[in-house]
Amino acid sequence: MLIRRLAALALLVAFCLVTGAAAAPPKDAMVVGLLAEPVTMDPPQITDLNSARITKRIFEGLVAQELGSYKLVPGLAQSWEISKDGLTYTFKLRPNVTFHDGTPFNAEAVRFCFERQLNDKSPYYATGTYPYVKSFLGNIASVEVVDPLTLQIKLKAQLAPFLQYLAHQSLFVYSPEALKKWGKDIVKRPVGTGPFKLDAWEPGVKVVLVRNDGYWGGAPKVRQAIYVPIIEAQARLAAIKTGEIDLTMDVPPDSLDDLRKDPNVVVAESNSSAAWYIALNTRHPILKDKRVRQALNYAVNKDAIIRDILKGTAIVSRGPLSPVYGPYHEESVQKYPYDLEKAKALLKDAGYAGGFELTFLVPESGSGMQSPVEMATVIQANLATVGVKAKIQTLEWGAYLKKYLEAPDMAEMSWNPSIGDPDHMMYMLLSSDRFPPAFNAGFYQNDKVDDLLRKGRTTVDEKARVPLYREAQKVIVEDAPWIFVDHGKQVIIYRKRVQGFKLHPNFDLVLTQVWLQ
């Protein structure tokens, strides 16, 4: 731990020496302290929040999300029409838009980007660790260029969240000519149409974006956006308090009261759509018994975790969907309150009164992972009180993600939905259609849930969709494929000189509207 802390502080010192930020950031540059180095800047290959927070400033999709909400607004498509049968979407693209390399944005460029992910015979085929487009939009029949500024996408079947998914970063549009020029190096040479463009990337030190003065939506007020990886929470806290950075997140929760009193910073908070849970391997010879999984839920003191570790920056999870999902959130499901006697009774009934041993996979840090090691230690102690020995195995985030999809006994995870549709949480994580390499890492399967979630995807009428997801939640919570822990609040800390910043429910850091005093 000490070595990692010193390494994180060394990175911060190196950043300050390079940028001159030790006293304060440049007057017209905004400095953001991220939790980790971005992994890639190629939209189809992004699986982490740190990469997404940067690349969303560089690239855009056909549709966008309104600032501060999941409401859809025009993006690179200025309008669209949907056929009566719900299978054909016709997009009218914005005229006179160019990529950062000067090449034109048009329908052929959009088709190229879709084709790259849908056609595994393409010489440029790439999806990264997780094939987002095939999972999100696997029922695409064709992507056709009608004319330079008109694109038509035909579906094999209706997909209710289709437009929502077009706002996901994996479907952002990039320069085909840049990809052809740089090939695999495109992961560090992003060329989009967005309000910022890449100026420099010094691995382990900083990523520098400069504003796109020719941006179709109007140039940002901030001249530069500088992102520095600061792995340790204490180092991020020190940097925001001294003014070395302008904005950060995931500082130690016990520091928030003092930060709220600091006249130089703003602590912005809101509930989120995120879920923090422990995936249980339902194929494990012991965990395949629902009674055991229920017992583990009763054995974990979630209220204590939120009170003592997270300092109130979360709410107890009832199930997979947070209250942010509004009518889709099923309030009647049980919370699995902390109840050791009930946990012991269930284990005895299942034949495991003497306890058993499991491997518990835990990341050292990562996108939205709150305080993973501290939380794991408490959960380990909770489980020990009912005879379950959870052997913690910690890994750095990149190695952890790979291991997570290799059927560990139990593993921590946080899911921060990029879109506001329940499909992105429930179908992606809990349908048997989404076994690894997709993200149903516990191999949970329930025929009734599968049927409800598939119907939810293809039912366009929202009033008809709501009861499908609410019923699915009841079954899922009863089955307990996860230890449902919490829905973390979004907490962003920024300096008072930052004006116009607004929280986004998917944890994005939108800077287009920001200005600096």
Give residue spans per PLM region:
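Aromatic- and charge-enriched surface segment that lines or borders ligand/interaction sites
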Residues: 25, 78-123, 152, 239, ...
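Ligand/substrate-recognition segments at binding pockets and active sites
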Residues: 32, 203, 348-419, 462
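N-terminal lobe/hinge region of extracytoplasmic solute-binding protein
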Residues: 33-84, 115, 122, 189-192
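Gly/Pro-rich hinge or "lid" segments in bacterial periplasmic/extracellular proteins
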Residues: 66-67, 148, 159-220, 224, ...
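Surface-exposed binding/hinge segments that line
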Residues: 92, 111, 129-177
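Ligand-site clamp/hinge motif
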Residues: 212-258, 389
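Structural transition elements
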Residues: 316-349, 367-374
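Extracytoplasmic/peripheral linker and loop segments enriched in polar/acidic and small residues
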Residues: 385-401, 406, 427-495, 517
